């Protein structure tokens, strides 16, 4: 009797289905929000000052990129609802795994950005973000990084 009204909890690890440009951008903005939290956590848990400083710098880059992407999205597709950004958690435990996750997911996002001319600014900003990711991958590799 009650089985018919009970809901199955959502699995937070399930893959989101991307059906529209709105879904694509909101999904990636949620990843960026989650990465900001993960970057802060890794920054606070950093074993050495060098990686602590680089994670702090990369956090600023993440935030600036997320803000520009969100504003560009809204300039094209209209305002988003105030409760739509919820942050997708990251389970990485060190800076190198973290930057690799950011890199691979950003490249997937980049390849899905619509090709219409109106999206070229977003594409260009994403290319700059990819360049920053590559830079910080190199810098993180110079640091003493051990699993936490």
Locate the predicted segments by residue.
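Charge-dense, intrinsically disordered terminal/linker segments
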Residues: 1-24, 121-124, 147-148
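Disorder-to-helix initiation segments
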Residues: 17-29, 35, 92-95
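Hydrophobic packing residues in well-ordered alpha-helices of helical domains and bundles
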Residues: 25, 32, 55, 99, ...
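Long, well-ordered alpha-helical segments
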Residues: 28-44, 69-72, 105-110, 133-143
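Helix-loop segments that flank and shape redox-cofactor active sites
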Residues: 34-57, 79, 112-120
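Conserved alpha-helical segments that form or flank metal/cofactor-binding pockets of metalloenzymes
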Residues: 50-81
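Long amphipathic alpha-helical segments
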Residues: 75-79, 139-148
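Acidic/histidine-rich alpha-helical segments that form the ligand environment
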Residues: 85-140
């Amino acid at each position: 009797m009650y089985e018919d009204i009970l809901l199955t909890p959502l699995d937070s690890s399930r893959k989101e289905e991307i059906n529209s440009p709105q879904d694509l951008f909101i999904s990636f903005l949620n990843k960026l929000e989650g990465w900001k939290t993960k970057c802060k956590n890794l920054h606070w848990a950093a074993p050495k000052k060098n990686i602590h400083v680089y994670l702090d710098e990369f956090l600023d880059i993440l935030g600036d990129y997320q803000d520009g992407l969100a504003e560009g999205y809204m300039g094209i597709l209209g305002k988003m609802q105030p409760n739509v950004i919820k942050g997708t958690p990251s389970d990485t435990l060190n800076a190198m795994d973290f930057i690799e996750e950011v890199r691979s997911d950003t490249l997937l996002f980049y390849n899905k950005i619509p090709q219409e001319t109106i999206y070229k600014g977003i594409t260009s900003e994403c290319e700059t973000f990819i360049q920053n990711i590559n830079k910080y991958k190199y810098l993180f590799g110079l640091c003493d990084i051990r699993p936490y």
